[in-house]
């Protein structure tokens, strides 16, 4: 089985699973969201990864910087990575939106896929940007919930995070490409052009 075929199987499994959750919600009036019931979907069923302007700049500025570099080595206080894979729409909000949007009618497979490609998006941000989201109380909430479908980046705009879509499905692929572009001493404009979708 190719990686593309395997990925498609994951999407189909996720669709079947969440149809069960919707059915249970309608019968029992209970939204199953806890107990790691969505973990598989949270970290496997998403679109192409994104990266913030600041994360790109920080990576390009330092030839020793890696995806796995620790905050404490770059001015931070924590022993976790400098680059945080952050959900543009907090996953608890994605869950709520899913139940609200499909409360009456199950999504067809393509509709389901479009929903998660749009709303379950990961963006690599610099740790200071992640800290700003926490300080503003935006760790797990979106203040413009009713207009979320039109502007998934509203939460980021409140703390000046600029997310750049990429052509990569995984963070490892993105950072490997960034490392090659850094070796070639590319400017940020060229880098953005090379990684974009």
List each model region and its residues.
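Residues that flank catalytic or metal-binding motifs in active/ligand-binding sites
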Residues: 84, 121-122, 152
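Conserved aromatic-histidine-acidic binding/catalytic patches
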Residues: 2, 6, 80, 110-121, ...
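Short Cys/His-centered divalent metal-binding micro-motifs
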Residues: 116-142
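Histidine-centered nuclease catalytic patch
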Residues: 76-116
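Short, aromatic/basic amphipathic alpha-helical patches
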Residues: 145, 149
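Glycine-rich, phosphate-binding/catalytic loops in enzymes
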Residues: 102, 142-144
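Nuclease and nuclease-like effector domains acting on nucleic acids or nucleotide cofactors
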Residues: 1-80, 137-139, 150-188, 192
């Amino acid at each position: 089985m190719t990686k593309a075929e395997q990925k498609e199987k994951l999407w189909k499994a996720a669709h079947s699973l969440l149809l069960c959750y919707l059915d249970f919600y309608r019968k029992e009036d209970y939204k199953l969201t806890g107990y790691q019931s969505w973990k598989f979907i949270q970290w496997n069923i998403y679109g192409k990864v994104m990266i913030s302007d600041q994360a790109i700049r920080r990576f390009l500025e330092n030839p020793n910087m890696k995806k796995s570099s620790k905050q404490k080595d770059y001015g931070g206080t924590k022993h976790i990575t400098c680059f945080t894979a952050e959900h543009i729409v907090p996953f608890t909000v994605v869950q709520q939106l899913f139940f609200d949007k499909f409360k009456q009618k199950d999504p067809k497979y393509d509709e389901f896929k479009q929903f998660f490609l749009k709303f379950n998006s990961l963006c690599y941000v610099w740790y200071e940007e992640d800290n700003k989201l926490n300080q503003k109380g935006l760790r797990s909430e979106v203040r413009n919930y009713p207009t979320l479908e039109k502007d998934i980046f509203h939460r980021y705009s409140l703390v000046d995070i600029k997310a750049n879509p990429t052509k990569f499905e995984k963070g490892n692929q993105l950072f490997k490409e960034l490392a090659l572009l850094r070796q070639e001493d590319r400017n940020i404009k060229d880098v953005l052009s090379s990684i974009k979708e």
